[in-house]
Amino acid sequence: MSDQNQPEQNHLYLVDGSGYIFRAYHQLPPLTNRHGVPAGAVYGYTAMLWKLAKDLHEADGPTHMAVILDKSGTTFRNDLYEHYKANRPPPPEDLVPQFPLIREATRAFSLPCIEEQGFEADDIIASYTMAAVARGWQVTIVS
């Protein structure tokens, strides 16, 4: 017999926060806050996260949820192949100061903001997915 207050199965939602950030950045015109700090990606990111949270709440959403971000720097893939993403440009200058604000906004949603030096968000998402599935959890990746 199951407890009425407990879900039948844990359901983990993993949000590709890096994907959200870049989509928000390229989707909106440049915006700044009253101090002149770029804020367009922050606005777009939080709007998308708010909509996701609202939709999930209305649908009796996940039992667990986390936002996964890329951490700047090299990854283990660079050690395996020195030219890995060698042609990829750095993030736009006006996006860089928004990263800490986006982390802060994520925490304001009471969501963990997970990032690990040496690993891309995709690698972390894959690891969390494998661990959750091994425990019998359902996993949804939001990208």
Feature locations, PLM:
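Noncatalytic, basic helical substrate-engagement surface that gates or grips nucleic-acid strands
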Residues: 2-142
